[in-house]
Amino acid sequence: MTIKILPPQLANQIAAGEVVERPASVVKELIENSLDAGATHIQIEIENGGANLIRIRDNGIGIAKDELHLALARHATSKIASLDDLEMILSLGFRGEALASISSVSRLTLTSRTAQQNEAWQVYAQGRDMETSITPASHPIGTTVEVANLFFNTPARRKFLRTDKTEFAHIDEVIRRIALAKPQVAFTLTHNNKLIHRYKSAVTNEQKIKRIATICGNDFMQNALHIDWKHNDLHLSGWVIQPQFARHQNDLNYCYINGRMVKDKVITHAIRQAYSEYLSNEKYPAFVLFIDLNPNEVDVNVHPTKHEVRFHQARLIHDFIYQGMTNALTSEQTNIPIQSEQSNPTKVAEPQGIWNLTTHNKGNRATAGKNIFAQQPKDYDKKSSQFKPHFAANYSEVTPKKAVQKAYAELLATHEEKTIASSTLPHQFTHNATHISEQKNVLHALALIENKALLLQQNQQYFLLSIQALQHFNIRLQLQQSNIAQQTLLIPILLRLNKQQYQSWQQQALFFQQSGFDFTDNSAQRRITLNRLPICLRTQNIQKIILQLLDQPHEKYTIFLTALCSHLEFPSLSTFSEAVNLLTKTEQQFSTQHQLEFQSLLVKIEWDHYLDKLQ
């Protein structure tokens, strides 16, 4: 048989085999189009499990008359225009395959009107021929897509559809997943003219929590822990079930990457690992998690259904999620009784920063292009940026754990006021003298200077403390503990060494072990494999640091430790509270032998010269 180019109709039907698996796939693709169009109210009407009719109506921006033909064409889209756009997907859809694939296996009618048009227009396409005709229609601003007789021209595929009840259950699950990610959008779902769900638009945090309770159940919310975990451009937020209330079925796990529902093995493994010490193999965790990260760091163009993603730094993502989950599961948190939308509303304590309250869409390229960062990353290209916060825009200060709150209360207390309890972290420290020592001569933190140093006072003397030196000292103290907290790597780091580096490794292997590193040594091939590392170094470029330490051997552990700390890199601290928090954590690790070392970090300020100039 000779090689031929397939006819467009056949190519579309092949594509439909990947995109349109069942009626629920059609519903998912059409709702994502509505969301990309900026819809705030979406109606879903289903007949006979979606086999006979799927009708999606929205109040989005609509499609212009002269673009209706293109809307049904394959690889026609308004969401990307170049390879650069493909590297940074901000919308839910982007391939331009859905409508063409759906129309090739059904009778599809698309009716739409934009705000600039006085009347609506309707386009109809049917089956393999996909010939379209446009006629005037009556319709408000927005779009309605009707998909009738799905798989009417592919009997083999229609035969494999399950019962109406089963197919509708899949559709219902799709709606639930999307409704969790888009609280600001109202959804109405009917089946055979019977109202099944009505999710009202959720504006306040209380309303959004109630939507989660409505979808996941009151039992879940009453026994769930709130998680809010950040590291650089990564942000993990949502709710996780307490281990003692884990489920016997793996049926309540919702995970979203930048607002897109996904199923990813890296994420699943990190979550299971965090729960591993609490759950048996017969129990499953329940969670609703939102992961926000730079879109350049994740590839969503992996599978036609877009359920699968690929991370550029999978190990970093895994470790970040694992640490966030572990922190949530081990922290003390108060359960909040929640009532669903159908119940009488009860006053609910407002959580800190789950949702972004402003989620309107801008532009066509960015249709659903709501970016997920509260602040733009330093290495991000500003010229190509259309970043807008996804969940982080209205974040207030993250509520600290009770232990941290107690520490701050003690820090802010004077000798006469140590019985006063504080439950909240002050936002302004400009005029607060912060106690950081239990010595008779109390040392006070007064201000953060240029994000580089803390101004401290002791009696009538003033000192500067370098933030970088404090960060290094903090790590040094953690690495000198007798029981160093370690983290197992999902993917061990394999290092092939030259002869000189391997000799250096043999000389310093004990030093690495004392510092909390766990290596496997293959002397025959001069290879070492890092299996575990100190948790305090998990955000560092550890491979680079190890090689730097091996390039210059150190004979004493103290010298080794100093060299290790000198290679560390830390993000700058932007607020006074962060600096005080770091100082607090450092002081909590103090012993008598560390006092002199800490004092050596202080630079005394002599004011006489400056005061003389004022006279």
Swiss-Prot record:
GO BP term, pick one: mismatch repair
Pfam families, A to Z: DNA_mis_repair, HATPase_c_3, MutL_C
GO cellular component, one term: mismatch repair complex
Keyword DNA repair: yes
Keywords, ordered alphabetically: DNA damage, DNA repair
GO molecular function: ATP binding; ATP hydrolysis activity; ATP-dependent DNA damage sensor activity; mismatched DNA binding
Record's keyword annotation contains Phosphoprotein: no
Function: This protein is involved in the repair of mismatches in DNA. It is required for dam-dependent methyl-directed DNA mismatch repair. May act as a 'molecular matchmaker', a protein that promotes the formation of a stable complex between two or more DNA-binding proteins in an ATP-dependent manner without itself being part of a final effector complex.
Family classification: Belongs to the DNA mismatch repair MutL/HexB family.
PANTHER family in the record: DNA MISMATCH REPAIR PROTEIN MLH, PMS, MUTL (PTHR10073), DNA MISMATCH REPAIR PROTEIN MLH1 (PTHR10073:SF12)
Name of the protein in question: DNA mismatch repair protein MutL
Provenance organism: Histophilus somni (strain 2336)
